[in-house]
From Swiss-Prot:
Pathway: Amino-acid biosynthesis; L-arginine biosynthesis; L-arginine from L-ornithine and carbamoyl phosphate: step 3/3. Its main location: cytoplasm. Belongs to the lyase 1 family. Argininosuccinate lyase subfamily. Disulfide bonds: none annotated. The keyword Amino-acid biosynthesis applies. The lineage of its organism: Bacteria, Bacillati, Bacillota, Clostridia, Eubacteriales. GO terms for biological process: arginine biosynthetic process via ornithine; L-arginine biosynthetic process. This is Argininosuccinate lyase. It is found in: Cytoplasm. Its EC number is 4.3.2.1. It catalyses: 2-(N(omega)-L-arginino)succinate = fumarate + L-arginine. The gene is argH.
């Protein structure tokens, strides 16, 4: 059944029907479409816009359709134009002429926006829940590796000694921001558009606030033209997902590097690795590589929607139907990526001794030698030059800083004493950095406490979302 006709004298071409159809992808919103329709028709009855007995009969029919679809007894007809027309035609088949009153006072324009917002509200809660699961994994990893020394890098060159906990907690901060962004995005999603009609509301005395309350929205939208033209909520969601995927991708890149034979910082579990069809020795980090690759896909989904919307006049245009495939793909890709990534890092093995050995080379404690001289009264810029010359000497002699004798140290400055050896011990280098945000155990404990509190507070916020 088509939801339009009358003024047409010819049948629409079959190719146009296929081109125009959205049932193949918007059918996933059948629950939201039915729930929205139940709220709408309940309001129609209570406001005496249609007879109350008709309202109850329609609502009962919609519940029956919902139950049968959930149970798999009723199958969605893919020849329908969209999920809205399928639900309405099925309703009329079930209950008769009263079903034709369902669409009183609304348009597909405000209906589809309602469905999408309801769907997104539910999906965002699922996404936040999965990011919190990932944060719990990072919390455990960091708690177990407060003293696991590793080299920190800049420009992919060894820079200063840090701990694995410090490194892991850097990513936890990124994911905290992702959760905060999604919660903020949810606030703007929480505006109910139904009642906006095609563009100029309706002449029926509908009660939009009542529908909003029934559906768990905090308020109604204030301008009907904007309500049916708006896809900011979809674009903003995809923007949040793009940032989230970027963070997963950066983490994946490091997982890939760390798992190489050249690094061996970690070993991925067999259950999250794959092999080669020709090289029997291979153990490939395909999960991390796919997360890295799928990030570009989510970026593409965002660019699709931005491009669709960039030149559209008010109000609704059929171009806007192109929002859903990109939106749904971005949602599904991100959710699967988070869940799989979490499993990968939860099961990976940390090679602590190799990390520490790596941190012991590459002069990662050079900055601490300069800081030592500063504490002895040398200006930092002079100390920097002294240590630069010292490093050049070490390179020429094939020595590490730790292996220099005191007399060799004194060749560069008479400020060096026996206490230099304690100052350049890697654990000392780390523990001296007690500044908020640093790698010392005391600082890491604070970061872990903050992460634990954030997880608890976010769960509480999640439970309050309608």
């Amino acid at each position: 059944m088509k939801l339009w006709g009358g003024r047409f004298t010819h049948q629409v071409d079959d190719l146009v029907n296929t081109f125009n159809s959205s049932i193949s992808f918007d059918s996933r919103m059948y629950k939201e479409d039915i729930i929205g329709s139940i709220a709408h028709v309940t309001m129609l009855g209570e406001e005496k816009i249609i007879p109350k007995e008709d309202s109850k009969k329609i609502a009962s029919g919609l519940y029956e359709i919902l139950n049968k679809l959930n149970q798999g007894v009723l199958k969605i007809d893919n020849s329908s134009e969209d999920i809205h027309s399928f639900i309405e035609s099925t309703l009329t088949d079930y209950i008769g002429e009263e079903g034709k009153k369902l669409h009183t006072g609304r348009s597909r324009n405000d209906q589809v926006t309602l469905d999408t917002k309801l769907y997104l509200k539910g999906y965002i809660k699922i996404l936040i829940c999965e990011i919190l699961n990932l944060e719990k994994t990072l919390l455990n990893l960091s708690s177990e590796n407060k003293e696991t020394i590793m080299p920190g890098y800049t420009h992919m060159q060894k820079a200063q000694p840090i701990t694995f906990a410090h490194h892991i907690l850097a990513y936890s901060e990124m994911f905290k921001r992702d959760i905060s962004r999604l919660l903020d995005c949810y606030k703007r999603l929480d505006e109910m558009p139904l009642g906006s009609g095609a563009l100029a509301t309706t002449t029926y005395p509908i009660n939009r606030e009542k529908v909003a309350n029934l559906l768990g929205f905090s308020k109604v939208t204030l301008n009907s033209l904007d309500s049916v033209s708006d896809r900011d909520y979809a674009i903003e969601t995809l923007s949040c997902l793009s940032l989230l995927m970027m963070h997963l991708s950066r983490f994946s890149e490091e997982i890939i590097i760390w798992s190489t034979d050249e690094f061996k910082f970690i070993e991925l579990d067999d259950s999250y690795s794959t092999g080669s069809s020709i090289m029997p020795q291979k153990k490939n980090p395909d999960v991390a590589e796919l997360v890295r690759g799928k990030t570009g896909r989510v970026y593409g989904d965002l660019m699709t929607l931005l491009t669709v919307m960039k030149g559209l006049p008010l109000a609704y245009n059929k171009d806007m139907q192109e929002d859903k495939e990109a939106l749904f793909d971005g949602l599904d890709t991100t959710l699967l990526s988070i869940k799989t990534f979490n499993g990968m890092i939860k099961t990976m093995k940390i090679n602590k001794s190799i990390m520490k050995t790596s941190a012991s080379s590459g002069f990662t404690n050079a900055t601490d030698v300069a800081d030592y001289l500063v504490k002895k009264g040398v200006a930092f810029r002079d100390a920097h030059e002294i240590v630069g010359n010292l490093i050049l000497y070490c390179i020429d002699e094939g020595k590490s800083i730790d292996n220099l004798s005191l007399s060799e140290f004194k060749t560069f400055s008479n400020k060096f004493e026996n206490d230099i050896y304690k100052a350049i011990n890697l654990l000392t280098c780390i523990e001296e950095r007690k500044v908020i945000g640093g790698p010392s155990i005391s600082s890491i404990n604070i970061q872990i406490e903050h992460l634990n509190n954030f997880i608890q507070e976010s769960n509480e916020k999640l439970n309050l979302l309608k």
